[in-house]
Amino acid sequence: MTLPVTAFVAAICALLLLITAIDTVRQRLRVQAAFGDHGDAKLISASRSHGNLAEYAPITIILLGLLETARANHMALMIVGAIFLIGRVAHIAGLYAKIEPGKAPVPRQIGVVATFGTLLALGGWTLWMLATVNL
């Protein structure tokens, strides 16, 4: 396969999207909500876990693919991809955790830091590759 790191991360994201989509549908059926969330905490958690992954996965996969195509170090790319995936799983778990008023659950915090760190690393790395390799 030409882009194995990108393919691996994309495949895991696809599975996570499917899992979160199925749970969102289950929650919608439970509260009989075709549209909106009806203020139901479980439906909100399910739909946001799916939506949040759908928001961050595409740019991460694109950046991984660009870097892999530019022959960036595969081991480093796999580590960054793994951090992203671990962060996404943590974020999903955090959205389902019991909420203390005014404080995000620790898994959600880990997920946010991992996701933002991944985007910063991949974005910076891509710009660095553009500035140094393609001159």
PLM-predicted stretches and their roles:
Residues 92-118:
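Interfacial loop-to-transmembrane junctions
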Residues 123-135:
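Juxtamembrane boundary at the C-terminal end of a transmembrane helix
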Residues 22-47, 98:
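Cytosolic, membrane-interface loops and tails of multi-pass inner-membrane proteins
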Residues 37-51, 103-112:
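Juxtamembrane helix-capping/reentrant segments at transmembrane boundaries
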Residues 3-33:
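N-terminal signal-anchor transmembrane alpha helix
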Residues 52-64, 119-120:
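Core segments of transmembrane alpha-helices
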Residues 65-87:
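Short alpha-helical packing/oligomerization segments
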Residues 13-16, 20, 64, 83, ...:
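Membrane-embedded alpha-helical transmembrane segments of multi-pass integral membrane proteins
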